[in-house]
């Protein structure tokens, strides 16, 4: 293991690799609390990033399995939940291990091409997650504000079409991300280092890139979601009890809406710190100290935890998901009873005492 000073030196250079002068790395004064950094880098990063990776992979894979294995759960909302789980799975695969490696190793060991691929998919999956939340909020808006008129629109076919559209748009518009990132090699104090960085020296604007990422992956989608939920709340306040929608159906929609709101709020909270730090770094206002290094690691952990927390939220907030999960774990695969050939309603009613393995709420 490297000495404490070497550990700080490594992480300091990796965090400031965009600046060839390394002006923020003070080799003589930044080691006053070396024991703190040793704990942060050597223990926190592997433990937390490893935990996030395992929970994110297992949890999101279970979400996909539970919904895909139960035909009665194939509603528009659940198709969007599957897409969110897939985006989170890809984010965990392409982001978590490589960010952890960049923190603890003095060299980027994967080469220039893989650097471009990793940065590209980080941006793609981050956008895919948040714009799936936008689609989920739009789905809730239509279900609450236009429950009858939206029945012909909120179909599985249209949900799959919307999902395909956001992936095509994101995969296409994110291509410049791979172009403007790459491996940079440098030497400092007779040591060879390399990092996967934004290639500002080729004329690309780091500030422009970070501002675009901040707006497109955080501000704009959350603004759209906020408008949709404000319209929903206005409609709910003005709506009178009774009407054409049954009380049971209304309660069901409120439960699903509450779950989507919680997922969106958790996303906003988890991603806020790292978005601010990345923006501050792009403005050249970021100074390397033990506090800022620790803050950046904590912010990364918080943002990446968002990719593994959604399955936990479903388990706590959705009785349907808990029932379906138990049936996948303990029941044999269903026989072909005609479900696969018929369009499914948004919500299926449980029969009897709920012990059937074929009908999911």
Curated annotation (Swiss-Prot):
Residues 341-361 are annotated as: Disordered. Expressed in the midgut and, to a lesser extent, in the fore- and hindgut of fifth instar larvae. Also highly expressed in the brain of fourth and fifth instar larvae. The chain crosses the membrane at residues 47-67, 79-99, 117-137, 159-179, 213-233, 260-280, 297-317. The keyword Cell membrane applies. Glycans are attached at residues 14, 26, 192. It is a multi-pass membrane protein. It is found in: Cell membrane. One of its GO terms (molecular function) is hormone binding. Disulfide bonds join 115-196. Residues 68-78, 138-158, 234-259, 318-361 are cytoplasmic. The keyword Amino-acid biosynthesis does not apply. Residues 1-46, 100-116, 180-212, 281-296 are extracellular. One of its GO terms (cellular component) is plasma membrane. InterPro entries: Galanin_rcpt, GPCR_Rhodpsn, GPCR_Rhodpsn_7TM. PROSITE patterns: G_PROTEIN_RECEP_F1_1, G_PROTEIN_RECEP_F1_2. Keywords: Cell membrane, Disulfide bond, G-protein coupled receptor, Glycoprotein, Membrane, Receptor, Transducer, Transmembrane, Transmembrane helix. Residues 343-361 have a biased composition (Polar residues). It comes from the Eukaryota. Its main location: membrane. Acts as a receptor for A-type allatostatin neuropeptide hormones. Belongs to the G-protein coupled receptor 1 family. This is Allatostatin-A receptor. The gene is AR.
